[in-house]
Amino acid sequence: MTKLIIMTLCLIMSFIFMQMKHPLSMGLMLLIQTFLTCLITSIYVKTFWFSYVLFLIFLGGMLILFIYVTSLSSNEMFSMSFSLTLISLIIFSIFTIVFFMIDKSLIEQFITNMEMEKLSNMNNLINENILSLNKMYNFPTNLITLLLINYLFLTLLVTVKITKKFYGPLRPMN
């Protein structure tokens, strides 16, 4: 049920994204879409690490896009369409009503099955998380982890040294 609601929200956000004209509103819709995608991946994957890293990567890219967009279109007026908001609210309400009009016994059976599955898999999930973290920091893979840490640190230093304070794609402040 939760998956259906989140996927419905993704479809509605995709529809709204196609109707947006201002770059900042497009960025906001893309950020919400990314958050919903991360929620879906966290439902399917047993650990939240993948969806967390995915969200951070998208957020970093969105921050860079936000800087470029605000420097290039800073004087453009931002306005929200009331009719678009109303249409999306009506579509979401219709989907919610359709979900709740499904046979109640199927919904109750689905909820009890999910609760029983959560209770039975809780111990397996805890043990699996501990084992996956142990694998990451034990001998064969700890070298890859250290290499990744050093590479990211070196990339950070090179990026700081390459960028100059008064040059670049952003407009100078007067």
Swiss-Prot record:
Keyword rRNA processing found: no
Transmembrane regions listed in the UniProt entry: 25-45, 48-68, 82-102, 143-163
GO CC, one annotated term: mitochondrial membrane
E.C. number: 7.1.1.2
Gene Ontology molecular-function annotations: NADH dehydrogenase (ubiquinone) activity
Superkingdom of source: Eukaryota
Keyword field contains Electron transport: yes
Subcellular location: Mitochondrion membrane
Annotated membrane topology: Multi-pass membrane protein
Main subcellular location: mitochondrion
Pfam families: Oxidored_q3 (PF00499)
InterPro entries associated with the record: ComplexI_Subunit6, NADH_UbQ/plastoQ_OxRdtase_su6
Role played: Core subunit of the mitochondrial membrane respiratory chain NADH dehydrogenase (Complex I) that is believed to belong to the minimal assembly required for catalysis. Complex I functions in the transfer of electrons from NADH to the respiratory chain. The immediate electron acceptor for the enzyme is believed to be ubiquinone.
Family named by the database record: Belongs to the complex I subunit 6 family.
Protein name according to UniProt: NADH-ubiquinone oxidoreductase chain 6
Native organism: Anopheles albimanus
